[in-house]
């Protein structure tokens, strides 16, 4: 599982990112850049992280009409990011357009970024989904439906809860990528996410990638916390 641990850089700006990455001199990480950081710093933060040798999951969760998403993905691919995402709720035409944009915008001689779709946010409970979003399926059924739609639209995988991974393996096969946020060490507060799991549990359930934020970024010693998460995730001593 080389570089399948993604560290969420949930910081307000570049200064905080630099302070955090100071703990990881010489380490090549797979990092997630979300809306807050990207909207503050723009493409320059991607250039900075790439120059440091890090892989990047640009987590913007695009959801718009197909042509707009295609154009946006063309631009994002030109930044040489490694992974991007959309909302599966945008539909098949939008997701197919996303792939077209990535293919058109990728740097010469390189593969297009991995493209995944969000099924349901990890902050979404089944009760919330039914009452507020108006989906009458069970949470598992809704996620499986979106995952199959994602695969049929030509995307590489989905963002999902670890608890949903086994079902998605049945529906979409073992090659389908599952990226699972909501990962916490057993001693951590779960904060605002409802469907959470430990790194060990994510490994047991078959996640392809895990995304870890506060357990590492808020730790007194981020490097040691990273090693602890990595050990639990990979099942080996590092």
Swiss-Prot record:
Residues that coordinate or bind substrate: 10, 32, 59-68, 122, 184, 193, 213-214
Active site: residue positions: 61 (proton donor)
Quaternary structure (record): Homodimer.
Gene3D superfamilies the record matches: Aldolase class I (3.20.20.70)
Protein name from the UniProt record: Orotidine 5'-phosphate decarboxylase
Record key words, sorted: Decarboxylase, Lyase, Pyrimidine biosynthesis
Lyase as UniProt keyword: yes
Enzyme class, spelled out: lyase
Source species taxonomy: Bacteria, Bacillati, Bacillota, Bacilli, Bacillales
């Amino acid at each position: 599982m080389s570089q399948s641990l993604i560290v969420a850089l949930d910081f307000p700006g570049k200064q905080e990112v630099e302070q955090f990455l100071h703990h990881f001199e010489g380490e090549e990480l797979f990092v997630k850049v979300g809306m807050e950081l990207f909207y503050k710093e723009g493409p320059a933060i991607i250039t900075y992280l790439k120059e440091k040798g890090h892989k990047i999951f640009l987590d913007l969760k695009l959801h718009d009409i197909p042509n707009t998403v295609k154009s946006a993905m063309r631009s994002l691919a030109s930044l040489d990011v490694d992974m991007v995402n959309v909302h599966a709720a945008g539909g098949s035409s939008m997701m197919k357009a996303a792939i077209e944009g990535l293919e058109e915008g990728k740097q010469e001689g390189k593969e297009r970024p991995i493209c995944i779709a969000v099924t349901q946010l990890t902050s979404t409970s089944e009760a919330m989904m039914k009452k507020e979003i108006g989906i009458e399926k069970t949470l598992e059924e809704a996620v499986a439906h979106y995952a199959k739609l994602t695969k049929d639209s030509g995307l590489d995988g989905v963002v999902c809860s670890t608890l949903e991974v086994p079902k998605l393996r049945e529906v979409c096969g073992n090659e389908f990528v599952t990226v699972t946020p909501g990962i916490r060490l057993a001693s951590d507060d779960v904060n605002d996410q409802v469907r959470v799991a430990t790194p060990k549990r994510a490994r047991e359930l078959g996640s392809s990638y895990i995304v870890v934020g506060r357990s590492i970024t808020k730790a007194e010693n981020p490097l040691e916390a990273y090693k602890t998460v990595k050990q639990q995730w990979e099942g080996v001593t590092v």
